[in-house]
């Protein structure tokens, strides 16, 4: 619920929702209409889905037109964000970072809060880059160890962590591991008076 917010009924209210979860108790927590519920291991369910025939191709142009309209209506970077102020706007920062990143970079946004959410909104991904999803599912402090693991798992490719100052402190001891293995991890920390997710609950 930390990723979809707490008002489940307003989560994609007009969408047909299909929920696949290995733990039925997790699906039971969702207070929303679920069109198809599958209690099972995704490893077993995905091959079954791959065997099905879908009639999505006819709807694809309509969906692409809708997406283009939404991108125009809700741009990731607005003129107001670009306006000069006494701090760097987070969206503008991610936009500039996107410009400077290379096709070989691995990008790891923090698992919770603005560092993750804004990065996913404003990052322009280049072919060849790897952007790691917030596999911590909102767990604060996930960023530093996740960047460490992502760097090692990708052959020590340059790894970019975008983290909030509060979350960064929770696993700061992993800096010793990063230094010991001389990992090419660059960290951008947002000093944003954070803990917004916690303060909002």
Predicted feature locations:
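A short acidic, amphipathic alpha-helical/loop segment
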Residues: 5-8, 96, 174-177
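Structural motif corresponding to alpha-helix initiation and N-cap regions
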Residues: 5, 91, 169-172
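Glycine-rich, acidic loop regions that bind phosphate or pyrophosphate groups
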Residues: 1-66
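Thiamine diphosphate
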Residues: 11, 27-30, 37-39, 43-49, ...
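Active-site diphosphate/adenylate-binding microenvironment
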Residues: 68-151
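Generic enzyme active-site microenvironment
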Residues: 19, 108, 162-163
